[in-house]
C-alpha cells in the first residue's frame, strides 16, 4: 500500500515539477534577453564595459558639439531618412558622417579638394550623403563588389558564414542612390574585392574614410589595414557596426584588437568607431 501511495504521489507531482522546471528555464532565458537588450542600450557588456572608450560626438569634431540651445550650426546637413533601406545606417550616424564630411571640406584651403573613401557602397545612399555635404570640390571614391563578381570574394579562415552571406547580399547593385543626381560627377565608383585593392594611387590621400564593407573578420582586418595607409595626416577613419559581442562579431573583435595599438573611440548612441591620424 505505501508503494502504491508513493507511485500515485509521483504521478501527480511529476507534471507540476516539469512545469516548474520549464517555467524556470523560460524565466532565466527572459532575464538573459532583457539583460542583453539593456547592455546594448547602455553600450556595455553584461558584466563589463566595452573595451573601446565611448565619447560624446563633440569629442570628435567641433562641428558636433552642442550647447544648452542645441547642436552647433556647423552640424547642419542634408540627409534622407533611413526608412528601412538595406544595409543602411541610422539617421544619427548619417548626420555625423555628413557633418564630418562637411567639416573636412571646411578645413581645406580655398580651391583645395577634399578626398573621401568608402569601403562598401551597398545602395549608395551614404555615398550620396558624403558627396552632397562635402561640397562641390569634394571627390568621393567608393568600392563594392559587382553582382557578377561574387566568385572573387575571398572568405577567410574562421570568417562567420553569416557575414559572407550578408556581404554578398548587399553587393547587388550597379545603379545606386546617387545615380543621376547632381553629385554623381563627384563620385568614382570602383567595383572589385577590397582585398585586391591596389592602394598605390590612394596612399595618404584621404581626409575621411568610412569602413562599412564586409563584416567578416578577415575583411574588417584587411580594410582597416588599407585604410591606415590611405589616410592623410589629420584625417579620420570611421567604422560602422561596433555593436558589442552579439552582432557583427568580426567588427567587434577586429576593432578591440586594433585598439591595443591605436587610439580608437566609440561615439555614444551610435555603432561608429573613430580613429584620428
PLM feature spans:
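N-terminal topogenic membrane-targeting module
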Residues: 38-75
